Curated annotation (Swiss-Prot):
Gene: pnp
Signal peptide: none
Primary location group: cytoplasm
The keyword Signal belongs to this UniProt entry's keyword annotation: no
SUPFAM superfamilies, per the entry: Eukaryotic type KH-domain (KH-domain type I) (SSF54791), Nucleic acid-binding proteins (SSF50249), Polynucleotide phosphorylase/guanosine pentaphosphate synthase (PNPase/GPSI), domain 3 (SSF46915), Ribonuclease PH domain 2-like (SSF55666), Ribosomal protein S5 domain 2-like (SSF54211)
Uppermost EC category: transferase
Protein name: Polyribonucleotide nucleotidyltransferase
Protein keywords: Cytoplasm, Magnesium, Metal-binding, Nucleotidyltransferase, RNA-binding, Transferase
């Protein structure tokens, strides 16, 4: 086929979608060019279904190539390795809005690969990758109820909302939001903000949805001209006989099981009912059904029972109404040797969160297409299998753990002090020890508590809450603080984090084909109520950061010196600074502007290092007494080292009142003496005297503790 292009304006960028030139053997392939950023997006779908696979096998792989910015990869092998955190997060960002648009029952394997071929570093390539994926699916012929559009939205008081901000514009923006959706509805939101109001967040979502229509129109035009014929795929037919048989015998029993408030007991009861259903209905005899069909029908029955009760306004699975937060238990300072710790429990979801402070040298070095940078705030989320009562594989973090950790980080990050105000590297680890819904938001609450316990001066405490949705033709219900079952059986996962003043993070994933403004507004309002309730409970335990960091944390001090004295502190080949560190046990960071940061295991070591640095960088004062050591003797006097790196001359006439014929009669090299500074000439040569030190001055000086 001949190449086909469609071009449209997107904010201040020109976007071109091209197909038919590159990767022509893929089911669908689109090259997206956004200014000088180029991303190749491919889709391959298998025609055959693996009958042993009980789920939809969609995989998304976003990869950044270093040649895109004219670089060769580091490391021994000099090639790209396993996915970076950025690549993993972007893969999830692409996956989330497209997954609900594949029809129910479609089980063919679909693989999406997005490769960044070139980037101008002005824009994150993620939006180009999302648009390219949508376009590749739209032209592939695969059953897909798209296309979707995607937009990044920024906001500040001067400009209001703005589309497709550059990396530089995001630095001054109060919002970084990615919105994705179809022509009619929003499907996904991912954002971080600086305490924006709920109305401002909702406005950003609506603005992004409105602006993405240009992209959707262009993608649809590309599909109309270059799209392949749609697959002749039909959804599997429901076996109404099986569903009726299940409902007749098990609907009431399933309803009773979902009135058991304890999660593990409820799961045991449902498992027993499922086994009973399989025993009665599954088999190879006449009138029996395949085991997989029975399992699928039983899952549908569970979903229908729970959803219908919620829509009818009945109590939820654990007996709550739609707006009630589960009981909270909050503890801080629970781990004795850590720098800060908290245990946050909400119902059957629990997070043990630990904050650790380190030096700026502990900051993580991140290499990306945008260049190298150091990250001094790390938040890691761990979800071990025991948290849900299972035995499972223990290994490195999975995509879900990386994504939940980043969401929790977004919720807290806006409240952190600046590096100038708090020059520590901060690591927070959230260990999920129990899980029954919204563990990422428990991590936000626990992180805020642990950071305050560690003495990190947060601008304000933050809390997070997860909202759910059940929607059908009869109406909808928004649920506050959803359980795991409500998340699984519902239509939306809507997570909001923030302070009393506003929202710091918002994430939304829709499992149906979009929601409207009314539902989002209701969810934001209920989330606001719940967040204030949780913050009120948190404040009864710890309302503000501790005034000092933990005694177990590194002692840190910052001093300013004359920038011209930096070389004196470093010394020849770094000898001086190494000696200070070896002698005191402290570590020292120097900035070009003369800022000296000193880190030590305790305050004594920090003070010793400070005193040494100040002594090295101090200027001698005329008339002041110093304790020095004779460094060298000459015929005309003696050179005395009286400050680190600073010598002065005691002339032969300034040793004693009487005449001196031989300096060595009075002084010897290595001898300790008390000297007075007489003068400093314009070449910074220091004149010292021993004889001018009076007996009274000497006695007072020796009585003063050495600094």
């Amino acid at each position: 086929m001949n190449p086909v292009k469609k071009t449209f304006q997107y904010g201040h960028s020109t976007v071109t979608l091209e197909t038919g030139r590159i990767a022509r053997q893929a089911t669908g392939a689109v090259m997206v060019t956004m200014d000088d950023t180029v991303v190749l997006c491919t889709v391959v779908a298998k025609k055959d279904v693996n009958p042993a696979q009980p789920f939809f096998p969609l995989s998304v792989h976003y990869q950044e190539k270093t040649y895109a910015v004219g670089k060769i990869p580091g490391g021994f092998f000099k090639r790209e390795g396993r996915p970076t955190e950025k690549e993993t997060l972007t893969s999830r960002l692409i996956d989330r809005p497209i997954r609900p648009l594949f029809p129910n029952g479609f089980m063919n394997e679909v693989q999406v690969v997005c490769t960044v071929l070139s980037t101008d570093r002005n824009h994150d390539p993620d939006i180009a990758a999302m648009l390219g994926t949508s376009a590749a699916l739209a032209i592939s012929g695969v059953p897909f109820n798209g296309p979707i559009g995607a937009a990044r939205v920024g906001f500040n008081e001067d400009k209001g909302y703005f589309l497709n901000p550059t990396v530089e514009e995001l630095e001054s923006s109060e919002l970084n939001m990615v919105v994705a959706g179809t022509e009619k509805a929003v499907l996904m939101v991912e954002s971080e903000a600086k305490e924006l109001l709920e109305d401002e967040m909702l406005g950003a979502v609506l603005f992004g949805h409105q602006e993405m229509q240009a992209a959707i129109t262009a993608i649809q035009a590309l599909a109309d001209e270059a799209g392949k014929p749609r697959w002749d795929w039909q959804p599997p037919t429901d076996d109404t006989t099986l569903k009726s048989a299940l409902a007749a015998e098990f609907e009431a029993k399933v309803g009773e099981a979902y009135r058991i408030t304890d999660k593990m007991a409820r799961q045991d009861a449902l498992s027993a009912l499922k086994d009973e259903a399989l025993e009665r209905l599954a088999g190879e005899e006449s009138g029996q059904y395949a085991a997989d069909d029975v399992k699928g029908a039983f899952a549908s029955l569970e979903k229908r029972v729970v959803r219908s009760r919620i829509i009818q306004g009945e109590p939820r699975i654990d007996g709550r109404d739609h707006r009630t937060v589960r009981p909270l238990s909050i503890e801080v300072g629970t781990l004795p040797k850590t720098h800060g710790s908290a245990v946050f429990t909400r119902g059957e979801t629990q997070a043990v969160v630990v904050a650790t402070l380190g030096t700026l040298r502990d900051a993580q070095l991140i290499e990306s297409l945008e260049g190298e940078r150091k990250d001094r705030f790390l938040l890691h989320y761990n979800f071990p299998p025991y948290s849900v009562g299972e035995a499972g594989f223990m290994g490195g973090p999975k995509r879900r753990e990386i994504g939940h950790g980043r969401l929790a980080r977004r919720g807290v990050q806006a409240m952190l002090p600046s590096e100038e105000d708090f020059p520590y590297t901060i690591r927070v680890v959230s260990e999920i020890t129990e899980s029954n819904g919204s563990s990422s938001m428990a991590s936000v609450c626990g992180s805020s508590l642990a950071l305050m316990d560690a003495g990190v001066p947060l601008k304000a405490p933050v809390a997070g809450i997860a909202m759910g949705l059940v929607k059908d033709e009869d109406g909808f219900a928004v649920l506050t603080d959803i359980l795991g079952d409500e998340d699984h059986l519902g239509d939306m996962d809507f997570k909001v984090a923030g302070s009393t003043a506003g929202v710091t993070a918002l994430q939304m994933d829709i499992k149906i084909e979009g929601i409207n403004e009314e539902i989002m507004e209701t969810a934001l309002q209920q989330a606001h109520e719940a967040r204030l309730h949780i913050l009120e409970q948190m404040n009864t335990v710890i309302a503000q950061s501790r005034s000092e960091v933990s005694d177990n944390a590194p002692s840190m001090a910052t001093i300013k010196i004359d920038p011209d004295k930096i070389r004196d502190v470093i010394g020849k080949g770094g000898a001086t600074i190494r000696k200070i560190c070896d002698d005191t046990g402290a570590s020292i960071d120097l900035d070009d502007d003369g800022t000296v940061r000193i880190y030590a295991e305790d305050k004594t070591a920090a003070k010793a290092a400070i005193d040494t640095v100040l002594a090295i960088t101090a200027e001698p004062e005329i008339g002041k007494l110093y304790r020095g050591t004779v460094a060298r003797i000459t015929d005309f006097g003696a050179f005395v080292t009286f400050m680190p790196g600073t010598d002065g001359l005691v002339h032969i006439s300034q040793i004693v009142p009487e005449r001196v014929n031989d300096v060595r009669d009075y002084l010897s090299e290595g001898q300790e003496v008390i000297v007075k500074v007489l003068d400093i000439d314009n070449r910074n040569r220091v004149k010292l005297s021993i004889k001018e030190v009076t007996a009274e001055e000497k006695a007072a000086f020796e009585a003063t503790p050495a600094e």
